[in-house]
């Protein structure tokens, strides 16, 4: 089972909402998915023509390149599909630095970011009480 990555289309909205683990708990996530598809750069990963993950790029983090979301179906985690989704976002990033955040509890994402040469550079408290958000950065090129 080989994963392929492509730009998302509006028609992918239902598939993204189905695989997103937050949608059942928080209906605002479905609206976020619609907004990302309309206004941001979204890539999807497919296995056997079925969407199994997605990644969102924008400039929502202090106008810097930002990976706003990486979501993979639980059955497809740990198979390097996250890496396949993040690589094109790095290529598209038009700022010298690319940022991403993840919860302290999300060890799998932390390992992925480290493997892709992101470096922890801070944290944000109180977004998810008791589970701070770690901020990561990857320097893509010299500033100036």
What are the language-model segments listed below?
Residues 58, 101, 121-124:
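Solvent-exposed beta-strand sheet faces enriched in polar/charged residues
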Residues 80:
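Glycine-rich phosphate-binding loop
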Residues 67, 94, 108, 130-132:
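Short secondary-structure boundary/hinge segments and terminal tails
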Residues 93-104:
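Conserved GNAT acetyl-CoA-binding A-motif
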Residues 73, 77, 101-103:
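Residue-level recognition of the GNAT/N-acetyltransferase active site
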Residues 3, 7-13, 17-69, 73-75, ...:
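Acetyl-CoA-dependent GNAT
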